[in-house]
Each structure stands twice: as structure tokens, then as C-alpha cells.
Amino acid sequence: MAAAAAAGPSPGSGPGDSPEGPEGEAPERRRKAHGMLKLYYGLSEGEAAGRPAGPDPLDPTDLNGAHFDPEVYLDKLRRECPLAQLMDSETDMVRQIRALDSDMQTLVYENYNKFISATDTIRKMKNDFRKMEDEMDRLATNMAVITDFSARISATLQDRHERITKLAGVHALLRKLQFLFELPSRLTKCVELGAYGQAVRYQGRAQAVLQQYQHLPSFRAIQDDCQVITARLAQQLRQRFREGGSGAPEQAECVELLLALGEPAEELCEEFLAHARGRLEKELRNLEAELGPSPPAPDVLEFTDHGGSGFVGGLCQVAAAYQELFAAQGPAGAEKLAAFARQLGSRYFALVERRLAQEQGGGDNSLLVRALDRFHRRLRAPGALLAAAGLADAATEIVERVARERLGHHLQGLRAAFLGCLTDVRQALAAPRVAGKEGPGLAELLANVASSILSHIKASLAAVHLFTAKEVSFSNKPYFRGEFCSQGVREGLIVGFVHSMCQTAQSFCDSPGEKGGATPPALLLLLSRLCLDYETATISYILTLTDEQFLVQDQFPVTPVSTLCAEARETARRLLTHYVKVQGLVISQMLRKSVETRDWLSTLEPRNVRAVMKRVVEDTTAIDVQVGLLYEEGVRKAQSSDSSKRTFSVYSSSRQQGRYAPSYTPSAPMDTNLLSNIQKLFSERIDVFSPVEFNKVSVLTGIIKISLKTLLECVRLRTFGRFGLQQVQVDCHFLQLYLWRFVADEELVHLLLDEVVASAALRCPDPVPMEPSVVEVICERG
């Protein structure tokens, strides 16, 4: 218990914890203190007593209860708890008392500071209100004094105020009379000094009074003098106006003064427009002089600035002054001004169009668009002043016309660039090859052409996109938001160029002897691949790029991408087919000459393959390499294992030599012809000019079919001796050894070469074939 005594109330304990509280402290106050402590620790009444919630509210041992009795509680603890538990309870109670004491001190200090602050604030407010009350009292006293003085002054000056008012009226009347009597002298002095505006204002101030009192002799004399002076003033103003030496504002001032003096408005209107016409025509002559051939013409931007500041600025001044001076003329006067502006505006527009026409050959649109922007902006002001003249609409039409011409110019530029690329390709293909230095291949030439054309297209799109830039004044016009984007750029420029490119490429497929006859086959192959690339990717790319840059906001019909792709694919197919025909005809020409220029009846026994056959194989190999640079391999049928070992008999491979050779004698030609015709009935029909696919195998197959078909037809027209037949047999075997690997189906080569040998046998009086082993030896040696 000593520890409990040591831990007694501290000096800072709150009143609720001290046993020295007020003597009359009520039980209700104690209950509130206990309730605050319970809320602070978050305990219910039962938990605070260490027993389950919901105790008997009349229990005297409940620490938090309203009927707590400390003596009963202590007796209970002494009876029920051992000494150790009592010591623990004491220690816990001391700890709780100290904690509660600290919390109570904190609460007291915090509330005390707030109370002190509130007290100071209230004291300050009382002092301020006390000063304010004193000031309000002094203000009320001063207002009472002022009111008293004001009443006394009003009472004193009431009679004098009436007299002063009368005297002021008399004084004003005297001043007016003095002004009237001095008016002639004032007008004369103003005219002598050139102060015409002041003189007109004087006359305007006195005219109504003089008109009203003109029946009085004195006023009549003043009016007569003023009329004489006014007439002289009007004459001088007219003279100054007619001289025209001053600028437009001064002339407008003269007209305004003349109108104020009562001069006829119709006559002044005509004279005003006539003088304005002279000044504006002078500006037009200056602009026309800048277009002359002798001095170097200024750039289009400078020309537009001159026209805008000179003619257009002058026209704006004339229109503004006319509408201000002659507003009373009504619709007739407005129409007269509109006709005046239309007549001069048409001449100005003609000069501007002449200058803009000189810019059509240039490739840069930036300067031209800036000039058109300034031209269009400067005509907004007269367009607003002269809505009936339609100057703004005419200016917009000029801008639209120039934009259309620029689109046509860029289309021609793209066509010229494409033709220039083709010329470069021709020169590269025709250039002699330097020993040890490889020239550009077809793939490189194709890449150069494609990139060059694409860069020109992008440059053209960027150039015409300047017409739709947001900072350009005319870009919000309906034409540039709709038709220019869809019909002008997309259809006219891009789609038009694709059509033109396809037409130009197809023109190389003309019949021999015309343009197509001089076209290098490699150029046909390159153009075919270029059109195929356009069909697969480029057309979609450039149209997507165009649609993204030029947001179309109208419903004009446009060409679908699929239509352009189909046209490009058809062009590529025609070019590739023509390439096959040209290359096939080149080889066919060699074979035809080799057959027609040889005496097959007097031919010696064959010892070698003819050189023309070697040339055919070499050219075919070169074509294979050339086509392989641009096209994929393609698909071949499964090849037989003996393709390079097969030899030709006198007849086709379907007929055994031992079976038919003994029966072939000069006495039995009908039997041999019959057998050949029967064999043809069961052979597969060969379509020489079948459609060509976009791969190397299909191209080589078409060329070889044309070549071998030509050889077959030439052989059918010749007569062969025994050794001539054997030479054909050797040549065909040599061709078979090398040509089968180029075609899609090797049976095609076998069939055609069988036909060649069989036809030669039919045209031979003594068809004795060479042994296959000998043929193989000769071909291997060759």
C-alpha cells in the first residue's frame, strides 16, 4: 500500500481524480466522468468491472456503475483475493491512475489554450466595436451639422437662385446672338485659312436659326452674307475635289462637306466614282507593267502584295467612303457601286490570272499557295463591303481553278517521271558491260524505279496538301473540303496516274513494227513485275496514304481499290504474255533461219550438234536467269528419273523403232502417214499460247512451246535426206537433254520433239535413223 500512497495525486491531476473536489459535487457529475472514461477506453460497464457484459446496474462493486461503493468493493477484494492478487491489483490501479492523470492534463492544457485564444479574440472584438461605436457617434454628429448648414444655405440662396437662372439664360441668348452677328466674318476667316470643315460646322449650327428668323431685317442680312460666303466655299471645295491631287480620304472629306452644304448628291456620286476610277485604273496599269516582258517580273507573292495593297486597298477605301457618304441613295446607289467594283475587279482578276499562269511550270507550291492565301484574304474586306459585286466568290473561283491546274501539272509531272524512269532503264539495259564490272541487275533497276515513282507520288501529295492546310484562308471552302480531296487528288492525281502508268505499260505490247517492236524484253519483264507489285501492295498503300492526308467530306463516287488492282494485274499479265511472245519469237527466228537456209538433202552425216541448238540452249538459260531475278520459281510436275537419258527414234517415243522401221519403205508411204495421224489422235493437244502465270516455270514453258512449235512447222515444210533426218534426230536429243528442266511438265518437251522427229521422218524419202547410242555420244561430245 506504500506504493499506492507514493503514487498519490500529482500536482497536475485533474479535478475528477483529486479527492479534494468541491464539497457539493453531485453524483450525476461523477457518473458523467465515469462515462467519459469508459468511452475513452472503449469499455462497456461489464468489461470495466472484469466480468461479462450486462451486469446488475445496482451492483455496489461495479467500478463503472452508478451505485459503486468503495468500502464494499475493498471488503470484497480482501475476502476473495489473495495477497499476490491484491498487489497486482494495486500495481494495475497505480498504472491506470497515472495514465488517466496524464490524459486529463493533456485535455486540460489543450482546452485551456483554446479558451485563452477565444478570450483574447472576444476581448479584441469588444475593443474594436467600442472604437467603431465612437466613430459612428462622431459621424452622426457631423451629418447633423451638415444637414443643418445645407438647410440654412438653401433658405438663404433660394431667391438668388432664380435670379441667377434668369441671368444665365440671358447670357446664353446674348452669346448666340453674338455668334450670329459674327458668323459672316468667321466664315470668311475660315475660308481664307482653308479650314473648310470648321466653316461648314459654323454654317450648320446657324442655318436653322437664320432660316427661322429670316423675316427680320437684321437676320436676313446675315443670311444673305452667309449664302454668298457658302457659295464661294462650295466652289473652292469642288475645285479641290476635281483637281484630284489629294488622296482618297481628302476627296471623301470634300464630298462630305459639299453634301453638308446641300449640293446635289447624284452629281457628287458620279464625280466621286469617276475620280475613284482614275486612281484605281492607275494601280491596274502599274500591275500590268509588272507583267511586261522587258523588266524581270517580281515573284508571285510580291505581285499579290502589290495588288492587295494598291488596288484592293484603294477599292476598300472607295467602297467604305461611298457607303458612308451616299447611304441615302438606297438600292440604286448600292447597285451603281457594285457595277463599278465588278468592272474594275474583273480587270484585276485578269491580271492576277496572267501572273498565276506564269507559275504553272514551277514544281514548288509553297510560294504559290502563300500568294493565293494573301490574294484571297485581301479580297475578304471588299467582299464584305460589296456583297452584291461578288468579288469574294470570283476570287474563290480563281483559287479553285489554280488548284485544278496544279493537280494537272503534278499529274503530268508523275507521268514524265515514270517515262524518265523507263528511259533510264532502257539506257541501263543498253549500256555496254565493262569487263570486270557488273552492271545493275533487273532487281536493282526494279527497286530504283519503284522507289523513284513512290517518292514522286509522295512529293506531289505533299505539294497539293498545302492547299488544304488549316492556316490557309480558303481551305475551309466546300471545294477544298470535298471535291478537291476526292475528285481532284484521289481520282484525278493518284488514280489518274495509276491508269496512265498501266496504259503506258500496255502500249509496249503493241504489234511488232510499232512501239512494241523496239522494246527490250527485259523492260517488258520489269514493267510486268512493277505492275504486279502495284497490284499486291503499292496501290493500297498510296490510296490509304491519300485518304489519311486528305479527309474526304463529300459523297462523290471514287474508284475502288479492287478495280485499280485488277487493272494493274491485267497489265502485268499482258506484259508478261508479250514478253513470252517476244522471247519465243527471237528463238523461233533463229530456228526458222537454221532450218530454211540449210540443204537437208545434201547434208553430210552428223558428227556434232548444230551451233544454233547450242545457242538456243544458251539463250533459254539466260532467259531463265533473267526471269528468276524478278519472279519466283513456280511449281513443276514430278520429274522422271530418265529425263536426261531419253533418245529419239525416227518416230515418237510411243512407237518402238524396231516395230515400225522395217515397214518404212518408199513403197508404203500411206501406211506411215496413217500411223502418224493415228498417233496424233491419241496425243495430248498442246496450247502454244496458253495463259502465262506469274512464275518462272510458266514463262519458260511458254517460250519453249513457241520455239519448238516453230521448229515443228519449219520441219514440216522441208524435205530431208537420210543424214538430214539424223541431224534433226541429234539436234532434238540435244534440246531434250537441256530444255526439260525449264518447263513445268517435261512430257511437253518430249511430245513436241517427238513431233519434230516424226515430221522430219515423214518428209524424208530414205528415213534411216541413227542408233540411239551414237546419238548420245554425239550429244555428250557436243
Swiss-Prot record:
Region of interest (Disordered), ranges: 1-37
Gene that this sequence comes from: VPS51
Protein name: Vacuolar protein sorting-associated protein 51 homolog
Positions of post-translational N-acetylalanine modification: A2
Comp. bias (Low complexity): 1-19
Effect of R490C: In PCH13; impaired association with VPS50 and VPS53 subunits; reduced levels of assembled GARP and EARP complexes
Keyword Electron transport appears in the UniProt entry: no
Superkingdom in the source lineage: Eukaryota
Positions of disulphide bridges: none
Compartment list: Golgi apparatus, trans-Golgi network; Recycling endosome
SUPFAM superfamilies listed in its UniProt record: Cullin repeat-like
